[in-house]
Amino acid sequence: ANTKGIIRTLLGRKCRFDLWEPTQWGVHKALPLNQAKVEYGDAIKRAGTYKALNRLIQGSAADQTKKAMVDVYEQTGIVPHIQVHDELDCSVKDEKQAKEIQQIMETCVELEVPSKVDIDLGESWGQ
């Protein structure tokens, strides 16, 4: 992020760090490169690169959840009712169908450390 101004999530989505700030400690507005050079001189650095690791983790988790949603639909025809963070809520006929969705979600992205998915079944979302 510091040198190229970009990181990529697990599935290749770009997260850009295009703004610049002075290297001196203090409260300064992050600006595009040309404006930052005019405002702060040559002693500038990329702004916000301390957020790169979090963007990588959160962005990759979002990629995985989105891919799981698409794979569940393509492989089962089931459309999730709602997605919250890393959770998909679906209506299923039986536990077998729920376990199929679980398997799809666990394998939608190949990882060295596997993802584990919990399933909860109930007559309604309140159970």
Spans of model-derived segments:
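Conserved catalytic core of nucleotide polymerization and phosphodiester-bond processing enzymes
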Residues: A1-Q127
